[in-house]
Amino acid sequence: MVVVGLGNPGPRYAFTRHNVGFLFLDFLKNKDWKTEKYFAWNKINLAGNEVALVKPLTYMNLSGLAMPHVLKFFSASLDDIIVVYDDVSLKLGKIRIRKKGSDGGHNGMKSIIQALGTQEIKRIRVGIGDKPEGMDLVNFVLGEFSDEEWIILNKVFEVMKEALEVILVEGIEKAMSIYNSLEVRA
């Protein structure tokens, strides 16, 4: 399995809502990242399986540029990939696991679908909450989580780790049936 977390590189974006994919990977393993030309990577063991963690080093909207390199580097197929990214249409505390689908308006996922030529890409969408009325969407997704939101987000990351283990052991359908209806609260 190769878990690709989406985000923007650099300290300016490190803790923003849009970087929830990177933040989840750091939750799983926050040290000793190695760097290739188009991505940073690491490995962990989940449910007795070696799992690669990947952060594209392009900006979010160009995430797809890294994907052919990721597939080649890890000798992976499309079926091995799971993409993790933020979803402004989901409430903070909720995740959605899917086997395939459209980009849903997410430019990072749009870039990946275009680069790989298919929508048949497994993904975990992470709710980052509704933007406040009157606030610009860009300012919201590039804003940082509050202390209260971090409490929820860390619990969400624990649930996501469990979900990855279920995907590895029992398959994505089982994980979808368990986790898509859950809502994590503080």
From Swiss-Prot:
One of its GO terms (biological process) is protein quality control for misfolded or incompletely synthesized proteins. HAMAP family: Pept_tRNA_hydro_bact. Hydrolyzes ribosome-free peptidyl-tRNAs (with 1 or more amino acids incorporated), which drop off the ribosome during protein synthesis, or as a result of ribosome stalling. Its EC number is 3.1.1.29. One of its GO terms (cellular component) is cytoplasm. It catalyses: an N-acyl-L-alpha-aminoacyl-tRNA + H2O = an N-acyl-L-amino acid + a tRNA + H(+). TRNA binds at Y13, Y59, N61, N107. The active site is at H18. It is found in: Cytoplasm. Keywords: Cytoplasm, Hydrolase, RNA-binding, tRNA-binding. Monomer. The keyword Cytoplasm applies. This is Peptidyl-tRNA hydrolase. SUPFAM superfamilies: Peptidyl-tRNA hydrolase-like. The record marks N8 as: Discriminates between blocked and unblocked aminoacyl-tRNA.
